């Protein structure tokens, strides 16, 4: 008789309850409370507008709202921790008081993450994979919150792209573990669009199963990014279909969470993908 493998529960535990990614792909809706993000800068930088947009995304199928107060687009101006907090904290407090939705704080500054979690955020999303701020992993450990460790590096000096990326990500895992973050509180992100050329981004998309095979939940953040614009020759606001294609490939290759702007359309795509892949173990009626 074949030995049975014990199936992982596939749960992300947060202080707002557990998120299961076993039956469905989780949707993270992007909320930039910044004046200069590449795709929606300035649209949601008042607390009231931020709340309305978060509510709309939650209604359209977002399980997590990812709030960022500093644009990460190439060439964006740097923002002080105080300025970043003045943007994100009021939005987090307002959304937490009005909506029953998980909030992730998109920051690489430990002080911002700390205040954001105190204000109601339940996940930390760090584009520097706990390598940008030496205190970030400790903040995640102190609050016992999940942390998304994204692949990034200062230079594109790869010897061999995929193995180098895997080594970089495992370095982030090691930093987090040494600070006291538990394995089940780590989520990985291959960092599409960060320290990668156009060709690199396409190559990573083609090898996503290698990253989902590491045993951690995998987040894919491709929404409206430049490599999609280059393939389709379209501006950011016209990249929903291209984003959808990347999401469908990602789901097929084992991604568990997708971070997107166009929640309504993408949620329909992931629901269809999940049904075809029989993700919940029983076909959806």
Describe every region a protein language model picked out.
Residues 2-23:
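N-terminal carbohydrate-binding accessory modules
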Residues 6-7, 14-15, 39-53, 72-94, ...:
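Active-site-adjacent loop and "lid" segments of alpha/beta metabolic enzymes
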Residues 12, 25-28, 49-51, 56:
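N-terminal structural segment of carbohydrate-active enzymes
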Residues 20, 26-48:
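N-terminal binding-site loop/beta-alpha segment at the start of enzyme catalytic domains
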Residues 31, 61, 124:
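Conserved hydrophobic/aromatic pocket- or pore-lining residues that grip, position, or stack substrates
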Residues 52-68:
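Catalytic domains of carbohydrate-active enzymes, especially glycoside hydrolases
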């Amino acid at each position: 008789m074949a030995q049975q493998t014990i199936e992982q529960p596939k749960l992300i535990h947060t202080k707002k309850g557990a998120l299961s990614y076993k039956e469905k792909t989780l949707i993270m809706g992007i909320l930039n409370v910044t004046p200069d993000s590449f795709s929606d800068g300035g649209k949601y930088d008042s607390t009231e507008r931020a709340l309305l947009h978060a509510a709309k995304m939650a209604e359209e199928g977002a399980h997590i709202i990812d709030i960022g107060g500093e644009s990460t687009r190439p060439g964006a101006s740097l923002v002080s921790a105080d300025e970043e907090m003045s943007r994100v904290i009021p939005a987090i407090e307002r959304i937490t008081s009005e909506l029953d939705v998980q909030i992730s704080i998109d920051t690489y500054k430990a002080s911002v993450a700390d205040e954001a979690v105190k204000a109601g955020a339940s996940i930390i999303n760090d584009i520097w994979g706990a390598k940008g701020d030496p205190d970030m992993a400790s903040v995640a450990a102190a609050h016992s919150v999940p942390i998304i460790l994204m692949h990034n590096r200062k230079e594109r000096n790869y010897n061999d792209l995929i193995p180098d990326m895997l080594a970089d990500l495992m370095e982030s895992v090691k930093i987090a573990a040494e600070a006291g973050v538990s394995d089940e509180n780590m989520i990985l992100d291959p960092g599409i669009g960060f320290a990668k050329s156009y060709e690199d981004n396409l190559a990573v998309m083609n090898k996503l199963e290698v990253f989902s095979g590491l045993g951690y939940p995998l987040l894919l953040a491709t929404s409206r990014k430049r490599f999609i614009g280059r393939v389709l020759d379209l501006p950011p606001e016209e990249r929903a279909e291209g984003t959808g294609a990347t999401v469908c490939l990602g789901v097929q290759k084992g991604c568990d969470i997708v971070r997107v702007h166009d929640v309504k359309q993408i949620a329909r795509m992931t629901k269809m993908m999940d049904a075809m892949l029989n993700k919940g173990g029983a076909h959806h009626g």
